[in-house]
Every structure is written in C-alpha cells, then in structure tokens.
Amino acid sequence: MQTTISLQVNGQPVEVSAMPDTPLLLILRNDLCLNGPKYGCGLGECGACTVIIDGVAARSCVIPLAGAAGRNITTLEGLGSKAAPHPVQQAFIDEQAAQCGYCMNGMIMTAKALLDRIPEPSDEQIRNELSANLCRCGTHVEILRAVRRAAETRRKP
C-alpha cells in the first residue's frame, strides 16, 4: 500500500507517495529526476548509488523509502553546478579522475562525507573509505590525488 513520506533532498522538503519498501535510489531517479546516483549492482556493493544521508555516505539502492523518512539526503546534484562545482567535484575534474564515469558518483559522495568528518585524512583513511566503491577503469591513483586536492583546497582561506 502506498504511503506519503516526507524527507529533505538537497536542502528542499519533498513528499513522495510510494510503497514504503521502494528503494530510495528509484525514488531519486524516477520520481525526483536526480540522476547523479546510478543503478549499478542493486545490492549495495558497488557504490554507484551512493548518497549522503544525515552526513553519512549510504547506498541508496538498499535503503527503503521508509528508512529515509525525515532524513536529510544529498545527491551529487546537491553539491554544485556546472558553473560552480563543489570543491570535491572540481578536484576530481582537475586530477582527471574519471574515465568511464561508473564510479564517479560514489567516489565523489564518499569523499565529500569523509572530508566533512575528517578534514585532513591520511592516505590510508582515504583508501579505507573509498575501498567499498568499485572502479572498473583503475583510476585509483587519480582518485586518491583528487581527494587529497579537495582536502587541500578546503584548508586554504
């Protein structure tokens, strides 16, 4: 049975009517037309669907809509724009960290959540945090450099 659920998406209040067990990813993509989070594995194992929920990177393909009720959700679209990318997005651009793009949403959203929590992470902390995001092209070195660059950019006055 459908129910109406209220949540915050990219700083805006949203009400969605759907089955409570509908994956949050489907609501974001199909109902709210937010295509930053991607459908990858559908099992929460690849990271392509990562969003930030209340400051924590989370896999939206395995979170039921009911589990997002009243929560603050940020998608890739909520970080920046083409004209003014978020510092993490800009760092990924500057370091040319993308090839096929499969992992970019998950890597960027996970990096943003990490840097919000730990402004100056070690390489080991960055690797540990990003290790659950599947990158098919192997741009791991560029991704690591991008996260380091984003951390440095945030430190500058």
UniProtKB/Swiss-Prot annotation:
[2Fe-2S] cluster binds at residues 41, 46, 49, 61. It catalyses: 2 Fe(III)-[cytochrome] + nicotinate + H2O = 2 Fe(II)-[cytochrome] + 6-hydroxynicotinate + 2 H(+). Pathway: Cofactor degradation; nicotinate degradation. PANTHER family: BLR6046 PROTEIN, OXIDOREDUCTASE WITH IRON-SULFUR SUBUNIT. It is an enzyme of class 1 (oxidoreductase). Induction: Repressed by NicS in the absence of 6-hydroxynicotinate (6HNA) or nicotinate inducers. In presence of 6HNA, repression is alleviated. This is Nicotinate dehydrogenase subunit A. Subunit of the two-component enzyme NicAB that mediates nicotinate hydroxylation, the first step in the aerobic nicotinate degradation pathway. Mediates conversion of nicotinate into 6-hydroxynicotinate (6HNA). Signal peptide: none annotated. Its EC number is 1.17.2.1. The keyword Metal-binding applies. InterPro entries: 2Fe-2S-bd, 2Fe-2S-bd_dom_sf, 2Fe-2S_ferredoxin-like_sf, 2Fe-2S_ferredoxin-type, 2Fe2S_fd_BS, Beta-grasp_dom_sf, Diverse_Oxidoreductases. Pfam families: Fer2, Fer2_2. It comes from Pseudomonas putida (strain ATCC 47054 / DSM 6125 / CFBP 8728 / NCIMB 11950 / KT2440). Residues 3-79 form the 2Fe-2S ferredoxin-type domain. Disulfide bonds: none annotated. Keywords: 2Fe-2S, Aromatic hydrocarbons catabolism, Iron, Iron-sulfur, Metal-binding, Oxidoreductase. One of its GO terms (molecular function) is 2 iron, 2 sulfur cluster binding.
